[in-house]
Every structure is written in C-alpha cells, then in structure tokens.
Amino acid sequence: MLLDRIGFYFPKALSNFLILYTCCICFSRIDILPRIVNVVLLITLSSFALYTYWKIIRVGAGSPLEYSFLKIQSIDNVLNRTEQPPDIIKDNCIFVKRDGSFRFCQTCEIWKPDRCHHCSKCNKCFLKMDHHCPWFASCVGFRNQKFFVQFLAYTTVYSLYVLLMTSAQLYSWFRQMKYKSELLDLHLLVVWVLSVIAAIATFAFTTYTIWLVTKNETTIEQYEWGNIRHDLEIYGDSINCNMGSVDNVFDLGSRSANFNCVMGASWAELLLPIQVRADDPFDPYANQGLFFPVQSDTYRIYRESVNLQQRLITRLTLRPSIEHI
C-alpha cells in the first residue's frame, strides 16, 4: 500500500520539481541575455510543459468502462459463447482473439474495442492504449495522446533552451577566468548536467513518438505487429494468397493524414494544448476511441480473416452437438 502511494506521487513530485528547479536556477543565474527575455522564455516554456503534464493526467487515456453498453453481463456466458458483444463491436472491430472470438477483459468485465488494452499497473482497460508511463504514473491513450506528444515537444525545447543558456553561462565564466577568484556555481553545473540528459532523452523519445504517430501506430501495436502478421499469413495460406504486403489497417495512406488525426489539422491545434476532436451529431460513438478510420483494402482483408475464423469456431462448436444427435 505504501509502495503504491510512493509510486503514484513520487514521479509527479519529481517531474514538477525538476522543471521548477531548473527554471528557478536559470532565473537567478543566467545573465548573458536581457533579463526580461530570459524570464519570458522560461515562463512560457516551463508553463507549457507543466500544463500539458497535468492535462495528460487529468484528461486520462479514456476507458471502455465509461460506456455501459460494453459491460459484460456474465463472464461465464462469454466463455461459453452464449453472450455476444453489442453490434458496435461486431460491426466495427477488426481484431479478434486467436480462437476467433471477440476480445474482452475478464478483469474489467468489458468488451474490448480495437486498440484497447488492459494495463496491469492501473488495473484498468484503456482506449487506444499506447503505453503506461511511469513519469505520470498513468497511461497514455486515445484522449491524452496529443497532449503527451506536445509535452514531449515542449520539454525537448525547454531542455534545449536550458542547455544552451547554461552552456553559454559556463563558457562565459571560464572565458573570463572567473575560476581564479570564485568557485564554480554548483547549482548551475547540476542544471547543465540535467539539461544534457533531458535534452538527449526527450529528443530521442519525441522523435520516436512522432514517427509512430505518422504511422498511426501505438507503441503496443509496434510490438504486436509481428503476431498480427503471423495470423494474416495463416489466413493467406487458407485462401492461397500472399499477405506479405498487407499494411497497418489504421494507416490512412499518408503521414500527414495520420499525424493530423491525432494532432489536428491547424497550426493552433498543433502548437497549443487544445482539444481537436469534435463530436459527430449523426454518430454519438464517432471520435470516441471505440473505432477508427481504416484503409478499405486492408480492412477487407482483415474482415475476411475475422469472418473465416468465426465460421471455423461456429463449425467446431456445432460439431459436438451434431455428434450427440
């Protein structure tokens, strides 16, 4: 219990402390820029980083538990195949379990839409789950993915700015040979080391995350694609078709389209932490993370694979009944 509390609060306290500490040190130690310029830049960058950090946590990834029609009435009936998922799952979900049945979570007792996964750390299912991030002690998914990408970008820019300023300040200190008359500012040196580490780490992770966004792929899907391709190859063998060229079904055909569906199409949506998804008055479940736009050709192949698996399961479950007649 105590360890759980520490694991929940410590990352948040540490993350905020590092941003505020480095910001305060740069406030008081940097004098190579006009003070007002330095203050405005530091406040702007650190504020964006802190705001998106807490927005990621407050908004959350989104969970299928919020939709009552996805609730399973009886796990036993689902396991016995006497309870079926709602039509929205049957009509829109592409991925099924290896035995051909629709995906569900026994822990949450919920039908799982495509891209939904259960987090063992949070003990909860999340929509379009990307990963569980220990720095937030929460999951990144459908609703907060945009803010997570922005947080990484803001933090990268902030880290690079702090690195540039502290490097220039330290260079000026050595160049003026102040080491002959005074000690090196330990706080400034610590902030420089932290900014080096943070700049490298956040830049690498930001690049990787944006790359996944342009592919319309989550971190989990990146690792699961091998299993999915294996299942499609089995289906391809059954119909004498080569499935080696099948793409990610959620790839919208261009990197810009994939990027815009997460980050928004306008510069304001891209640069500012504002919501980009509008409700569809004709479909209350659109843009809710329950289902996603797909490539028509790839979708057809996936659906044929699902239908084949469903027919095989139906045939196998009917055989014992026929044999007992």
From Swiss-Prot:
Q: Which reaction does it catalyse?
A: L-cysteinyl-[protein] + hexadecanoyl-CoA = S-hexadecanoyl-L-cysteinyl-[protein] + CoA
Superkingdom of this protein's organism: Eukaryota
Its Enzyme Commission number(s) read 2.3.1.225
Q: What class of enzyme is it?
A: transferase
Q: What is its main location?
A: membrane
Q: How is it modified after translation?
A: Autopalmitoylated.
User: What kind of membrane protein is this, topologically?
Assistant: Multi-pass membrane protein
* Residue ranges crossing the lipid bilayer per the database entry: 6-26, 36-56, 147-167, 186-206
Q: Which InterPro entries match?
A: Palmitoyltrfase_DHHC, PFA4/ZDH16/20/ERF2-like
Ordered alphabetically, the record's keywords are: Acyltransferase, Lipoprotein, Membrane, Palmitate, Transferase, Transmembrane, Transmembrane helix, Vacuole
| GO CC annotation terms, alphabetical | vacuolar membrane
Tell me the residue ranges located in the Cytoplasmic compartment per UniProt: 1-5, 57-146, 207-325
Domain (DHHC) spans 103-153
Q: Which residues lie on this side of the membrane: Lumenal?
A: 27-35, 168-185
What are the protein's GO molecular function terms? protein-cysteine S-palmitoyltransferase activity
Query: Where in or outside the cell is it found?
Result: Vacuole membrane
Instruction: Please give the record's comment on domains.
Output: The DHHC domain is required for palmitoyltransferase activity.
The family classification in the record reads: Belongs to the DHHC palmitoyltransferase family. PFA3 subfamily.
Primary role: Palmitoyltransferase specific for VAC8. Palmitoylates VAC8 at one or more of its N-terminal cysteine residues, which is required for its proper membrane localization.
Q: What is this protein called?
A: Palmitoyltransferase PFA3
Source species, please?
Answer: Kluyveromyces lactis (strain ATCC 8585 / CBS 2359 / DSM 70799 / NBRC 1267 / NRRL Y-1140 / WM37) (Yeast)
